């Protein structure tokens, strides 16, 4: 079985002192880049999709594509619902075969966040589906959800333990100073907060908003307990900019099989670097 849950992946990463990258994909080409690169580097990876991606590509289509590529490359893959907010939407996709879910209602008050997350956990665990949730809130925009910098807040380590125990989640996404999107300047990550969270929470920890972080910062977060690194914007930017450049230089180009190659190559460079930064090459 090549389509797997993230639970074992992240537990292996936790024991091994590395992180598993979760790459947000959008179509056939972006998925090809992630899977082909991961297979060539023998690295465990997570294929992540926001609600918008699943709407764009179709849940059944994405599931079939992940399954086919996992078998083709003899490489274990996990497909993950990223930043999903609605129970019915999650339930439908779980019934379609998705094995990993992020329920994100971190904008709600603490008690409501617990209640909504626990409802999803209770349902998903019946199907052996792993669940990630977020405590604290990142600034920036992910899909159609935008959080102003003033409304972002960091994860409280003591609350994090209560949250993890009350919900039964399998992994916890933390807010320590990252944001969705690219950074105008390098963020100042709160490493001491992350270290405290690890001491209070006995779960794999997840870092969102990793696009544009330095290798040094990524590797320091892994040392302090991060087991899953989410990358989205950096992939889109590399793909899109290379495509724009190619079409500007070759205005006569009309064959997608040709002009998409430069976009895939640029994105492949990002995927390779993230895998190396996460220390997961050769771990699949």
From Swiss-Prot:
It catalyses: D-tagatofuranose 1,6-bisphosphate = D-glyceraldehyde 3-phosphate + dihydroxyacetone phosphate. Pfam families: F_bP_aldolase (PF01116). It is an enzyme of class 4 (lyase). One of its GO terms (biological process) is galactitol catabolic process. The active site is at 82 (proton donor). Keywords: Galactitol metabolism, Lyase, Metal-binding, Zinc. CDD domains: TBP_aldolase_IIB. GO terms for molecular function: tagatose-bisphosphate aldolase activity; zinc ion binding. Binds 1 zinc ion per subunit. Its EC number is 4.1.2.40. Dihydroxyacetone phosphate binds at residues 181, 209-211, 230-233. Its cofactor is Zn(2+). PANTHER family: D-TAGATOSE-1,6-BISPHOSPHATE ALDOLASE, D-TAGATOSE-1,6-BISPHOSPHATE ALDOLASE SUBUNIT GATY-RELATED. Catalytic subunit of the tagatose-1,6-bisphosphate aldolase GatYZ, which catalyzes the reversible aldol condensation of dihydroxyacetone phosphate (DHAP or glycerone-phosphate) with glyceraldehyde 3-phosphate (G3P) to produce tagatose 1,6-bisphosphate (TBP). Requires GatZ subunit for full activity and stability. Is involved in the catabolism of galactitol. Belongs to the class II fructose-bisphosphate aldolase family. TagBP aldolase GatY subfamily. This is D-tagatose-1,6-bisphosphate aldolase subunit GatY. It comes from Escherichia coli O127:H6 (strain E2348/69 / EPEC).
């Amino acid at each position: 079985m090549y389509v797997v849950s993230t639970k074992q992946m992240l537990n292996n990463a936790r024991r091994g002192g590395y992180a598993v990258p979760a790459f947000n994909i959008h179509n056939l080409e972006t998925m090809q880049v992630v899977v082909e690169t991961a297979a060539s580097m023998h690295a465990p990876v997570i294929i992540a999709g926001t609600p918008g991606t699943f709407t764009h590509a179709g849940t059944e289509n994405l599931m079939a594509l992940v399954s086919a590529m996992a078998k083709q490359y003899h490489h274990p893959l996990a497909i993950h619902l990223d930043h999903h907010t609605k129970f019915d939407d999650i339930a439908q996709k779980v019934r379609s075969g998705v094995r990993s879910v992020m329920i994100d209602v971190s904008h709600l008050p603490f008690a409501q966040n617990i209640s909504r997350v626990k409802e999803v956990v209770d349902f998903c665990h019946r199907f052996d589906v792993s669940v990630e949730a977020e405590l604290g809130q990142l600034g920036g925009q992910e899909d159609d959800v935008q959080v102003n910098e003033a409304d972002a807040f960091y994860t409280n380590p003591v609350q994090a333990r209560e949250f993890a125990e009350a919900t039964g989640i399998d992994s916890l996404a933390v807010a320590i100073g990252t944001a969705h999107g690219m950074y105008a300047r390098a963020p100042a990550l709160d490493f001491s907060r992350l270290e405290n969270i690890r001491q209070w929470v006995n779960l794999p920890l997840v870092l969102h908003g990793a696009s544009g972080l330095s290798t040094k910062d990524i590797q320091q977060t892994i040392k302090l307990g991060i087991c899953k690194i989410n990358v989205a914007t950096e992939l889109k930017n590399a793909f899109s900019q290379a495509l724009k450049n190619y079409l500007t230089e070759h205005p006569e180009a009309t064959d997608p099989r040709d002009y998409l190659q430069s976009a895939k190559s640029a994105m492949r460079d990002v995927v390779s670097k993230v895998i190396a930064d996460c220390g997961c090459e050769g771990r699949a």
